[in-house]
Amino acid sequence: MMDQLKTGAVDILYQVADGDQIEQGLDMVEDGSFNYLSYGRAGYGMISFKCNQGPTQFKEVRHAMAYLLDRVTFAQTFTGGHGTVVSGPYGTQQWMAEEYAEELDGLNSYTYSLDSAVKELEDGGWVYNEDGSDYSGSGIRYKKLDDGTYMPLVIEWFSSENNSVSDLLVTSLQQNPDVEAAGMKINQTVGTFTDLLTYYYDSSKENPYQMFNLASGFGNPYDVAYQYEPGSSNNTNALEGEEGQKLYDLAITMNHTEEGDDEAYAKAWFDFIADWNDELPEIPLYSNDYHDFFTSKLHDFEEDGYNWDATNAILYANME
């Protein structure tokens, strides 16, 4: 890709996210014939859960899994140092995140901790062996359900083939010895991306999978209410009940902010993010830093990827 820019086949490459490509581009910039822009992505990569069936229907399990993944190391490894960890469905480039940066820092970051994971599971009732006796301290934990049956703490994960994020999740989460030590097991099934989307959009309780990994971007204006509308096919997390309704209501409140009242909108946005951070229907994995690389003959090209993107910026740029 960078070779095309270097040879002049193209004049600009935008939203480059691969760490190796970014480093190659920065080396080219040092030679003096190219320039670049860098900005945070208005989106993120995540683990997405089904919240209406299996162990992940229980918030404590979702919390425990977050505690069992070193997200800081994961993000740095995957992005090659050109990315960061966020605490909800947002990107660092969004103006709301800049306005509420201090408050966002105060949200639960789910810092890696086996002890915290175990406490969440114990508080959530995962305190039994398969036969109903008190958990012995090794093996799979079980939770007693309202119907008297015992549910094993086994999560079924569907991932797409040839996916570097999935590969990293295998080593950093699925095969992490602390996952077993916590009394949890994650089974991985690998298939096509088409198959992944089929299961991802299936919010029936018969769906055999509860965990997926993929990425999402956010539009401008930021509107996610449709993704959390109870009973909607767009509600891929299938977050239901009072918790799901509350999250949806917060998203609607954000959308109904009076036009031009940026302060009220940003406050409503943060209220949504804070509740989302507690419900945790998804685990944010990384938010990339995008880079645009372009010939030094291109002038006045300025974008931030969200408030003012490349489709706008190119209209005001000029070539020597």
What is the predicted function of each stretch?
Residues Q57-Q175:
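Append "and occasionally in soluble cytosolic enzymes with long acidic Gly/Pro-rich linkers
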Residues E120, E243-K246, L250, A264, ...:
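Amphipathic coiled-coil alpha-helices
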Residues K6, V10, E30, G54, ...:
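Sec-exported extracytoplasmic/periplasmic mature domains
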Residues Q15-A17, Y39-R41, K50-N52, T77-G81, ...:
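Active-site-proximal beta-strand/loop segments in catalytic clefts of secreted hydrolases
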Residues L5, N176-S233:
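Periplasmic binding protein-like
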Residues M1-Q53, A64, V72, Q76-T77, ...:
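Extracellular/periplasmic solute-recognition and catalytic clefts
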Residues G25-A42, S48-F58, W95-S116, N129-P152, ...:
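Short, solvent-exposed loop/beta-turn-alpha elements that line the ligand-binding surface or hinge
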